[in-house]
Amino acid sequence: MQKIIVFILCCFMTFFLYACSSKFENVNPLGRSFGEFEDTDPLKLGLEPTFPTNQEIPSLISGADLVPITPITPPLTRTSNSANNNAANGINPRFKDEAFNDVLIFENRPAVSDFLTILGPSGAALTVWALAQGNWIWGYTLIDSKGFGDARVWQLLLYPNDFAMIKNAKTNTCLNAYGNGIVHYPCDASNHAQMWKLIPMSNTAVQIKNLGNGKCIQAPITNLYGDFHKVFKIFTVECAKKDNFDQQWFLTTPPFTAKPLYRQGEVR
């Protein structure tokens, strides 16, 4: 009888812990900025990235008609009063009293990187296609996105322990995990869905893992030597534990306007 009671209690505790963890996994990816706490799709985009408009020549669009109007500025944040939560001691909690915490994830001000491109082995560069905040992030090859300019350029806001927020040079918005993909949204240093861990790989690439959902950025590769002139969907998926191509990202020089190596008429 005693064993049965213990078994029932164990089952109850397992169910309780699972229910609690599931509740906090299925929360609003925009944090306190827009929508209800448990709304996993506040922008009503769906959970899968939908392909951009089929354009003969890829070009930037406004995209204001694709998403609802959302606050331009992030919600107010504060620093923690706890001596145990600071830049040296780690990450402040995401939740407080079954709501989002309003404290900064890290107490310190971030260092800011130089401008860079985030480029996958397939040639897919993380790119803002629709300028209005809340639109999906896509992967474009550099040659097919020449007209996008700084929408393909990023800066890292660098925090301790290889964490960073990733800010677009054109829109000044940050990468925000959303559903199974990524949107760009006003930078909010209290939102765990905007904080990314850079995990070094042996070939100088990095995996980019989201703090909020624990998943890594992926651009699926179907043909490593043939995936040219295509638009890549960008996902967040379970982080690969073994060798892979589609979760590798190189932080490399930005594609600002380059001068030609030779002028017309010069000997080559």
Swiss-Prot record:
PROSITE patterns xrefs: PROKAR_LIPOPROTEIN (PS51257), RICIN_B_LECTIN (PS50231)
Gene3D superfamilies in UniProt: 2.80.10.50
Domain Ricin B-type lectin: 112-252
Covalent lipid adducts (N-palmitoyl cysteine), residues: C20
GO molecular function: carbohydrate binding; toxin activity
Region (Mediates binding to target cells): 129-140
Signal peptide: 1-19
Keyword Lipoprotein on entry: yes
Subcellular location: Cell outer membrane
Keywords: Cell outer membrane, Lectin, Lipoprotein, Membrane, Palmitate, Signal, Toxin, Virulence
Pfam families: CDtoxinA
Membrane topology: Lipid-anchor
Residues covalently joined to lipid (S-diacylglycerol cysteine): C20
Cited InterPro entries: CDtoxinA (IPR015957), CDtoxinA/C (IPR003558), Ricin_B-like_lectins (IPR035992)
Assembly, per entry: Heterotrimer of 3 subunits, CdtA, CdtB and CdtC.
Function comment: CDTs are cytotoxins which induce cell distension, growth arrest in G2/M phase, nucleus swelling, and chromatin fragmentation in HeLa cells.
Name under which the protein is recorded: Cytolethal distending toxin subunit A
Naturally occurring in which organism (per UniProt): Campylobacter jejuni subsp. jejuni serotype O:2 (strain ATCC 700819 / NCTC 11168)
Name of encoding gene: cdtA
